[in-house]
């Protein structure tokens, strides 16, 4: 299974490299950070994230929204991290938004606002079903 190396969006010098690939057997996007921390997102989770962001924001920009203290208290503003937190109520999982956003951008589902602060995206490929996600991830 081929891996892709990508970089988070942040202020110059603070960006982080990470590796990602799609595990077809488990139908899971696997992300490994510079610190060798793994984040895994199922196709159903990714579909839910894209659908929820489309419903909440339409074609408008949404924030990263992955502040650990605010996520833990459930007080983070609506955005990518908060959608992930609602899925599992797991701050570590939700903080992976910084990586997942870049992957979804590289796959053509999101557009980045070209800012290092505040980082944001918008949905540009709405209505993705599980089959379309699988095809996008397997045709890297």
Predicted regions span which residues?
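Long Lys/Arg-rich low-complexity intrinsically disordered regions in nucleic-acid-associated proteins
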Residues: 66-69, 116
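Minor-groove-contacting beta-hairpin "wing" of winged helix-turn-helix DNA-binding domains
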Residues: 117-126
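A short, conserved structural fragment
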Residues: 105-118
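Long, low-complexity, charged/polar intrinsically disordered regions in eukaryotic proteins
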Residues: 1-66
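Short helix-coil junctions and helix-kink-helix linkers
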Residues: 69-95
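Short, hydrophobic-biased segments on the C-terminal half of alpha helices
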Residues: 98-102
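Short, amphipathic alpha-helical interaction segments positioned at domain boundaries
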Residues: 126-140
């Amino acid at each position: 299974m081929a891996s892709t190396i990508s970089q988070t969006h942040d202020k110059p010098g603070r960006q982080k490299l990470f590796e990602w690939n799609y595990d077809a057997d488990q139908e899971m996007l696997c992300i490994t950070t510079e610190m060798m921390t793994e984040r895994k997102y199922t196709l159903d989770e990714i579909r839910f994230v894209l659908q929820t962001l489309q419903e909440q924001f339409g074609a408008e920009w949404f924030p990263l929204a992955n502040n650990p203290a605010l996520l833990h208290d459930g007080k983070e503003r609506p955005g990518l991290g908060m959608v992930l937190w609602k899925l599992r109520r797991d701050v570590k999982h939700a903080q992976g938004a910084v990586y997942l956003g870049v992957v979804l951008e590289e796959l053509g589902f999101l557009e980045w606002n070209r800012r290092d602060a505040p980082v944001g995206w918008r949905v540009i490929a709405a209505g993705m079903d599980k089959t379309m996600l699988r095809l996008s991830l397997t045709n890297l």
